[in-house]
Amino acid sequence: VANVEKNLQNALKTVKAESESGSSLIVFPELYLTAYTCGDLFLQDALIQSALDALIKFSKETAYSDAVIVGLPIKKGGELYNCAAVLQSGAILGIVPKTYIPNYNEYYEKRWFASSEKVNCSSVIIDDEEVPFGSNLLFTLSSGAVLGVEICEDLWVPVPPSSELCLNGADI
């Protein structure tokens, strides 16, 4: 938990092994780079910056892979978002923030994270590059497949984001 460097190293090993075995899409869990269970550590700027630095390094060091999705927290406009970063060939293709933030039973993500519904921009700057940012992004993979992304609770609602993503052309 909160050991971003260790999580990064494990992710790099996984991508190498999976790429060598022929995987064309590698997906890591929600908030993988920090771990999901950081609690109030998500309020620490050092953790958020460490995750962003790890994402930049991860994208560069996995340039040989087809497509990778990894979870991390991203701060934008004074809000913190639970996001999935889509990487391909060394580039960060886009950042998808979670839309439905659970706040019941053992889930209390609203303590730390904002919904993508609060997003009032279409991009973020990462490593001096403008990167698309939004819950409605579609990504065309090298195979030609079109990918849409939703995160955990997003799938559990009556009309999940994937419904609109599919209507707009997502295959995966």
Give the predicted meaning of each segment.
Residues 1-172:
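Enzyme catalytic cores with a strong preference for nitrogen-chemistry domains
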